[in-house]
Every structure is written in C-alpha cells, then in structure tokens.
C-alpha cells in the first residue's frame, strides 16, 4: 500500500532518501525552511515553513495527513512528535528517539548516566561565565558545541583561555533552536573516528554496516571511507554499544553511531537517528544497499535479508568558498574521466563558505587499498570548482 511520507528537512541526505522511497512507490512531501531545497526537487509536494514554529508544523501535518514523518534535521519542534504518534502517525525512528537525539544534552546524559557508556569528560554551560567554569573543570584542549546544531556549525576547539570569547560567540551564531546552552567536551586523543551505521527493524534483528572511517574539519566531515580498519574486539564492542543505545531510544530506521578509537579504547561520541553524512560513501556501491535504501526499507517495514560489503569506497566533499546564488560547477569532465569514480551534485540553490555542495566518489575491488581509493576521491574533489553569482 502506498504511504504518504512527510520529510522534515530537505537537504542532500533527504534527497537520496526521497529517491529511495520513490523507487518503492511512495508519495513524499518535502519540507524545509527555504524553497527548492535538494529533496524538494525530487519529491511529489513541497512545503516551506519554519519547523521550529509548532503551529506551522501542526498546520502542514493536518493539511497533508501523512502516514509517516521522517525528520532529517535538528531544528524542528520535536516535542510535537509525541502528539503525532498518539494520532497514529509513524515518527521515524520514534518520537522518543527524535527528541533525545536532536539535543546533545539528552543523548549524552542517556549514554553516560543511564546506559553507562564511556564518553569524553563533559560539562554544560548556558552563559559565557559558566563556559569559563566548565572549561576550567574539563581542561584544555576541549571542544565546545551548541546543544543543537549540525555539520559542525557553532563548534570550535578551545586551546587557551584566549579562545573562550570566540568559542561562546561562535556557538551562539551556529546554534539551532531556542537553547543557548553548549556542551564542553574534553579532547579525546583519538587516532580514528568511525561511524557504525546501525539498522533497527520493525520485525527483524538489529543489523550493522561495515564500519566507516571519516575525517572532520570545523566539526564537519571532509572524507569518509569504507571499510575502516578496526580490530574484531573493538568492532564487537561498538556493535554492542550501538545496539544498546538504539534499543533504548526505540524505533525503526538507520542510525549513524559515532565513536572515537583511541589508544586506551573506544569512546561513544554521538548518534544521529537518520542517514549520516559520512554514509554517503555507500553511494559508491560499497554495500548491497546504500544507507538511504536501508533507511527506506527499515522505515517501511520491508525485509533486509543481509548487509554485505561489495567493494572498497571513499567519498570526499566538494565545498563552496564564498557566498552567492545560482551555483555552477566546472571540472566535472576532468573528475569523471578517472575510472571507478562518480560524483553527486546536491542542487543547493545558494553557496556560502564551507557549504557542502556535492561529493566525489571512488571505489575499487574488495581487498583494494582503501588509502589509494580515498586519495582518488580527494583528488577528484579538488578538480571540481564551485562558482556563484
């Protein structure tokens, strides 16, 4: 039976999800705060509202009467989801999961205090004065993040007391939602960051994708690769942690569970209840299902017989370097001239410095050197130039 799916947030991850569910025959309303967002370009209907406005959110839900609501971003009045669930609407993964994971304080306290997971030492601060005290307790270097933000917005590293003023002002400029509060995390001396894509199903066991390695700058991913080399014991531990936290949050869908790998072991970092930006590497055909296809199947209650690695792959971000509109792209011929490569241009209508506008993809046979594949993706990303008016 055809489902009516409302997507809240219509960026590049949402675009690929829409394509996946449209291929399965479903109807999609794509919602965002601006018109012509990437997912709106491939959806059946579109709405443009401020999703932090509860009345506006209620109005479009009442107008369209969706069967399923799929959040893609943090800046949503997520407490409304509990009411929608009571009305019989499926919220993905669940209203509880969406509310907990849209706020770093809720998910960190759940992970550390309730579930006893190992995390970086952390404190919270709701003012510049509290931030100074929190940093004094945590020590430097440390990372300051808004409780609600994505793609590294508002995130900075404090190395000395002189950085505190900037850290506070930057966190406030990059936050989403109403809360001014930030989380202060002690720096973990990790050697690898991984994402463990975890799939919870309505009528099946929890499944795991092969681990994805990634590198970040300014809190935003720059490259990702799959598989990431990790010991069997650490992988098993990561899977146990991912299953524990997703079971607590409840619901069906894909989750991006992030970990730090350090010399002294594994640290839980963050969790997203939706396809993960680092998981765009699966668009390179690394698995038998992309993360978006897995999300679609899990959300719709369709079977996922198994997840298997098909080949080695990598993704690298194509970013803008200035503010503008009507972006154009050059260098595609050169980038696509390399064998075993591909590219995705997201279709965002405007640019700004560091804004992610596309990704290059590279792949090779199973067992190939992942560093070589990653280098190819990075080299191709540098060939693509973004211009705008």
From Swiss-Prot:
PROSITE patterns: ATP_GRASP. This is Formate-dependent phosphoribosylglycinamide formyltransferase. Keywords: ATP-binding, Ligase, Magnesium, Metal-binding, Nucleotide-binding, Purine biosynthesis. Involved in the de novo purine biosynthesis. Catalyzes the transfer of formate to 5-phospho-ribosyl-glycinamide (GAR), producing 5-phospho-ribosyl-N-formylglycinamide (FGAR). Formate is provided by PurU via hydrolysis of 10-formyl-tetrahydrofolate. One of its GO terms (cellular component) is cytosol. Mg(2+) binds at residues 258, 270. It catalyses: N(1)-(5-phospho-beta-D-ribosyl)glycinamide + formate + ATP = N(2)-formyl-N(1)-(5-phospho-beta-D-ribosyl)glycinamide + ADP + phosphate + H(+). GO terms for molecular function: ATP binding; magnesium ion binding; phosphoribosylglycinamide formyltransferase 2 activity; phosphoribosylglycinamide formyltransferase activity. GO terms for biological process: 'de novo' IMP biosynthetic process. Homodimer. SUPFAM superfamilies: Glutathione synthetase ATP-binding domain-like, PreATP-grasp domain, Rudiment single hybrid motif. Its EC number is 6.3.1.21. Belongs to the PurK/PurT family. Residues 109-300 form the ATP-grasp domain. It comes from the Bacteria. Pfam families: ATP-grasp (PF02222), PurT_C (PF21244), RS_preATP-grasp-like (PF22660). It comes from Chlorobium phaeobacteroides (strain DSM 266 / SMG 266 / 2430). Gene3D superfamilies: 3.40.50.20, ATP-grasp fold, A domain (3.30.1490.20), ATP-grasp fold, B domain (3.30.470.20).
């Amino acid at each position: 039976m055809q489902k009516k799916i409302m997507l809240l947030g219509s960026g590049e991850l949402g675009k690929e999800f829409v394509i996946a569910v449209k291929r399965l025959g479903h109807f999609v309303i794509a919602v965002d705060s601006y018109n012509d967002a990437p997912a709106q370009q491939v959806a059946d209907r579109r709405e443009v509202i401020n999703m932090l406005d509860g009345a506006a959110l209620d109005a479009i839900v009442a107008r369209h009467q969706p069967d399923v609501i799929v959040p893609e971003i943090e800046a949503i009045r997520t407490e409304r989801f509990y009411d929608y669930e009571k009305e019989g609407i499926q919220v993905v993964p669940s209203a509880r999961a969406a509310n907990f994971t849209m706020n770093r304080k809720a998910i960190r306290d759940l992970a550390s205090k309730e579930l006893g997971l190992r995390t970086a030492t952390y404190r919270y601060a709701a003012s510049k004065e509290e931030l100074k005290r929190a940093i004094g307790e945590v020590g430097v270097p440390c990372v300051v993040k808004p409780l609600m933000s994505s793609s590294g917005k508002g995130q900075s590293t404090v190395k000395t007391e002189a950085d505190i003023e900037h850290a506070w002002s930057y966190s406030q400029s990059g936050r989403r939602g109403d809360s001014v509060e930030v989380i202060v995390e002690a720096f973990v001396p990790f050697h690898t960051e991984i994402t463990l894509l975890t799939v919870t199903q309505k009528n099946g066991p929890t499944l795991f994708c092969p681990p994805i390695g990634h590198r970040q700058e300014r809190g935003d991913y720059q490259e990702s690769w799959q598989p990431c080399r990790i010991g069997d014991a650490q992988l098993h531990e990561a899977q146990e942690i991912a299953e524990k936290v997703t079971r607590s949050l409840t619901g069906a869908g894909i989750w991006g569970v992030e970990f730090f790998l350090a010399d002294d072991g594994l640290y839980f970092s963050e969790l997203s209840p939706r396809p993960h930006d680092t998981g765009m590497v699966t668009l390179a055909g690394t698995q038998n299902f992309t993360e978006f296809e897995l999300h679609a199947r899990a959300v719709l209650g369709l079977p996922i017989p198994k997840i298997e690695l098909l080949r080695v792959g990598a993704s690298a971000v194509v970013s803008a370097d200035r503010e503008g509109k009507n972006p154009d792209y050059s260098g595609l011929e050169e980038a696509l001239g390399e064998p075993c490569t591909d590219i995705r241009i997201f279709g965002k209508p405007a640019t700004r410095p560091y804004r992610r506008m596309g990704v290059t993809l590279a792949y090779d046979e199973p067992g190939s050197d992942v560093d070589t594949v990653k280098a190819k993706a990075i080299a191709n990303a540098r060939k693509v130039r973004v211009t705008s008016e």
